[in-house]
Amino acid sequence: MSNQDLINCKSNSGLTYAKAGVDIDVGNAMVEKIKPFIRSTKRAGADVEIGGFGGLFDLKAAGFTDPILVAANDGVGTKLKIAIEVGIHDTVGIDLVAMCINDLLVQGAEPLFFLDYFATGKLDPEQGAAIVSGIAVGCQQAGAALIGGETAEMPGMYAKGDYDLAGFAVGATERSALLPSKDLAEGDIILGLSSSGIHSNGFSLVRRIVQQSGLKWGDYAPFNPQMNLGTALLTPTRIYVKSLLPIIKTYKGIKALAHITGGGLPENIPRVLPSSLCAEINLSAIHVPPVFSWIAKQGKIEETEMLRTFNCGIGMVIIVAQHAVETITQILEMQGEIVTLLGILTKHPTKKILYKGVLHL
């Protein structure tokens, strides 16, 4: 054996970052795969070129004069476990964007940019690229630029194939257009926009119900025979920006919005109400999608628990003045939204939400 062979042998026996489980070359390969998705989210104020130490956004180029910045962050929760087990990873990317962006929207903000955090035990470039492709689709739906993110390969932290996601979004609104407005009053009307399904809350309970039912992800969904169960449950969260933002910016008829996520109607509507007002909701008016009826029946879940765990068919609540109801409803329906007249604001000394009727589960 030559001296050079001895040197090569010694160098090959030494530890490397890749041998410890973190392969920088694989990470670089994934970056190349996702660049086209990222470029597809370009908008005024951002060039969406990645590789720097931070993402840049030009507020002046976005057309703001007296802006207030609004920030939000969120995740997808245990819906990810279904995505991992089914092997469909793009739709949870849309969920990630939706959970953050809809929270910006309720304060009247136009989404500007988005950043993601993707953590896994062993990086799979195809899996990662699928996730980012979904994030890009969500950003396109929201009009937000995907200006950066972090991919963390952490051996020993996650089981094989598992991953977690977190999203961070920033938007802006003119100071005068910040929601909720200060003129919320008794008699204002409460409208609801239909959800696309479960969205991204309550999946720990959903997964327990599926487990107890004995169903497999590949079985036909009992609530939708045209789809298998896994695909149906992975229907992505609806993003309401393109329907609501033009009304917020031009018509000025919306007084408040509430994104119906964890806690459902009873926890989220009161977040936008002043102390003197109460939301009176007619539960009988809600068209409950079949997936929620199946969940309630299969899990023997009471109405109150359904309402505080799931959106039950209403993904966004809108509060408007009575004179604006007809116009706003027409605009939203032209945008493809299903609008429900949910109720009215009343005065109550202690209650923040009151129910009439029953939820037709």
UniProtKB/Swiss-Prot annotation:
It comes from Bartonella quintana (strain Toulouse) (Rochalimaea quintana). It holds the Pfam family AIRS. Pathway: Purine metabolism; IMP biosynthesis via de novo pathway; 5-amino-1-(5-phospho-D-ribosyl)imidazole from N(2)-formyl-N(1)-(5-phospho-D-ribosyl)glycinamide: step 2/2. Transmembrane segments: none annotated. NCBIfam families: purM. Keywords: ATP-binding, Cytoplasm, Ligase, Nucleotide-binding, Purine biosynthesis. CDD domains: PurM. It catalyses: 2-formamido-N(1)-(5-O-phospho-beta-D-ribosyl)acetamidine + ATP = 5-amino-1-(5-phospho-beta-D-ribosyl)imidazole + ADP + phosphate + H(+). GO terms for cellular component: cytosol. The gene is purM. It comes from the Bacteria. This is Phosphoribosylformylglycinamidine cyclo-ligase.
